[in-house]
Amino acid sequence: MDVQETTAACRDAFAELASPACIHDPYPFMRWLREHDPVHRAASGLFLLSRHADIFWAFKATGDAFRGPAPGELARYFSRAATSPSLNLLASTLAMKDPPTHTRLRRLISRDFTMGQIDNLRPSIARIVAARLDGITPALERGEAVDLHREFALALPMLVFAELFGMPQDDMFELAAGIGTILEGLGPHASDPQLAAADAASARVQAYFGDLIQRKRTDPRRDIVSMLVGAHDDDADTLSDAELISMLWGMLLGGFVTTAASIDHAVLAMLAYPEQRHWLQADAARVRAFVEEVLRCDAPAMFSSIPRIAQRDIELGGVVIPKNADVRVLIASGNRDPDAFADPDRFDPARFYGTSPGMSTDGKIMLSFGHGIHFCLGAQLARVQLAESLPRIQARFPTLAFAGQPTREPSAFLRTFRTLPVRLHAQGS
């Protein structure tokens, strides 16, 4: 069998994604990958898929062609796996499990994390959105610049998770301060200092959730933690405390920084494409289309952080991925693949108008929440936060504009912001 030679010897995709040029704009490099090296083998031996069709297939094939790492196998990919609290927690999360364990855990949590139950949070989310916008209004009306990233995009998911988990807001702000640190420490090329910092933050989160679970067990309320503490399936199986902690840790990691980044990108789209703001002034279906296009254009997690292990030799595009190889998918690239989305670099909410969530009018799937058995449980929660925020920002601040150049965090994994300065412009200015 002829095997296409990749360009790993002269170009490592993960190193390139961490470069200043890619931090600023990764999409030209992703286009290069799709066209020249769509099944890329990095210097570390990891494989990275960049075409929509291959990524979509890999998502669907998880549990068949791919599996999660077996217990103890993380040491192949992370040298400190045996001693790292963060990596041990990662290994215990739902995202790392295969059927039948995955099936059992997913069933238990899905009973209390349905789309309908998340929709029931809309009034609370709307209240939080209104309060945060009230808080920044005086400064904006005085003509001052406001960092919308810090004052709104970061704060909203923190406060929503506090509501969801039934915990004090101040406690959530303290825990959330370490989430970005944990995520960077779990990257495929994280340094020892980054992993050590992640471990310290994870230990704090783990201890807090252990205490929270005990409080909910003795004094249950109408929140997701209380529901999970009492969750059981048809065999009266219950979640252990260790499973509960890893579940909550995984939910917070997967849904906090990424939601904040999506809010930032949505505001960026509002300001960069004023001709598209009309999508936020009409019915809910048009708002949903705007939200889906934001999620497609700028996936907050550019590639999958979870190792997917090939269960057999797999040939994609003339490249053989050997059995037991670690395969990751470049989600942000798949979302910009012209074979899936026409004119993919153009921001066009119409491509998602009147469709099922995540599906374009051409029947292609937006990849930011994954697909298949590991589809993101928090997808609806993120969508609701965006849908409740954007029309209110547009209505409250129709003259909102940039107050300076937004700055990004120097991350190869997360496409997130450090600052997003905005101010109000006088009408007609």
Curated annotation (Swiss-Prot):
GO molecular function: heme binding; iron ion binding; monooxygenase activity; oxidoreductase activity, acting on paired donors, with incorporation or reduction of molecular oxygen
Swiss-Prot/TrEMBL cofactor(s): heme
Annotated Pfam families: p450
UniProt xrefs under Gene3D superfamilies: Cytochrome P450
Record keywords: Heme, Iron, Metal-binding, Monooxygenase, Oxidoreductase
Binding sites annotated in the UniProt record for heme: 376
Family listed: Belongs to the cytochrome P450 family.
PANTHER family: CYTOCHROME P450 YJIB-RELATED, P450, PUTATIVE (EUROFUNG)-RELATED
General function of this protein: Cytochromes P450 are a group of heme-thiolate monooxygenases. They oxidize a variety of structurally unrelated compounds, including steroids, fatty acids, and xenobiotics.
Protein name per Swiss-Prot or TrEMBL: Cytochrome P450 BJ-3
Organism: Bradyrhizobium diazoefficiens (strain JCM 10833 / BCRC 13528 / IAM 13628 / NBRC 14792 / USDA 110)
Taxonomy of the source species: Bacteria, Pseudomonadati, Pseudomonadota, Alphaproteobacteria, Hyphomicrobiales
Gene responsible for this protein: cyp114
